[in-house]
Amino acid sequence: MFSSLYPLARASLFKMDAEDAHHLTLRALGAAGRTGLACALSARVPDAPRTVMGLTFRNPVGLAAGLDKDGAAIDGLAALGFGFIEVGTVTPRAQPGNPRPRMFRLPQAEALINRMGFNNHGVDQFVKNVQAARYRGILGLNIGKNADTPIERAAEDYLYCLERVYPFASYVTINISSPNTKNLRQLQGAGELDALLAALKDKQQRLADLHGKLVPLALKIAPDLDDEQVKEIGDTLLRHKIEAVIATNTTLSRAAVQGLPHADEAGGLSGRPVFDASNEVIRKLHAEVGSEVPIIGVGGIFSGEDARAKLAAGAALVQLYTGFIYRGPALVSECVKAIARERTA
């Protein structure tokens, strides 16, 4: 039902400020989940099970982190047919993020630019929201560092968040690739990444012993990487036996949107313009890690064929964000069906 109404809703939402529309949609989804009205949103999406990271996904099409930073609308989002949901990024302490305006639509390019800056209510409230959700599917919890934490002490924030979210996560994503937190992408450097992942894997094992379950770790990386950086990241993932990698986050490049309104705004660009760059990173990374580190492909998916292209590049699963905002819940079903056809062809 909601899928058929979404084009009308989008026309109204796109007349609003981008961030105001975002908050309004999240509030509506959150209310639907809390009141049981989520059944009215329920989408008919076929099952297409896939096992990755030792987890069985209802289908391989997930929601990327960033849409629901505080985990406040999990049940409403779950009704839309996603095979898994990822919420966050959350930081140890609440923080407001960057000054507004900080989210911009580029409709001519079917793109968004954001410089949100990990705005969230902090990990304690995040955990309460996750615990309150009735959803029992695969749930990824995405963690980051506070803006005022020195980059040299970033590991402390990640370790703290990992400990807090671990009991409630199907998997935990380590976000080191947002361009909107100063110096964060430095953690993708070989030495910095090696030290961070070593600390996180040690913590993961101790938490697994404590809770009696091993929660997989996924690393989220940027598309703005050269071949040597991709190789170094691949080697580090293999060395530390990280369970998955999410490729990719938003790009700093503006090559595909030059001259468009808002194109010069600072922040990360997502949507169609990042599709090819994301796929290229997926291909190169897959050549390095093979099947040992599953890749979750995200970036510029607007059709079932786009989702299939991610898998052809080497991804095991895909996630939607900007395409979902532009096309609505119908995109979820379209992607699942396209992938299912590919597997039975």
From Swiss-Prot:
It catalyses: (S)-dihydroorotate + a quinone = orotate + a quinol. GO terms for biological process: 'de novo' pyrimidine nucleobase biosynthetic process; 'de novo' UMP biosynthetic process. This is Dihydroorotate dehydrogenase (quinone). The gene is pyrD. Binds 1 FMN per subunit. Transmembrane segments: none annotated. Catalyzes the conversion of dihydroorotate to orotate with quinone as electron acceptor. Its EC number is 1.3.5.2. Its cofactor is FMN. InterPro entries: Aldolase_TIM, DHO_dehydrogenase, Dihydroorotate_DH_1_2, Dihydroorotate_DH_2, Dihydroorotate_DH_cat, Dihydroorotate_DH_CS. Pathway: Pyrimidine metabolism; UMP biosynthesis via de novo pathway; orotate from (S)-dihydroorotate (quinone route): step 1/1. It comes from Burkholderia lata (strain ATCC 17760 / DSM 23089 / LMG 22485 / NCIMB 9086 / R18194 / 383). Substrate binds at K69, N114, R115, M116, G117, F118, N175, N180, N249, T250. The keyword Zinc does not apply. It is found in: Cell membrane. Its main location: membrane. Pfam families: DHO_dh.
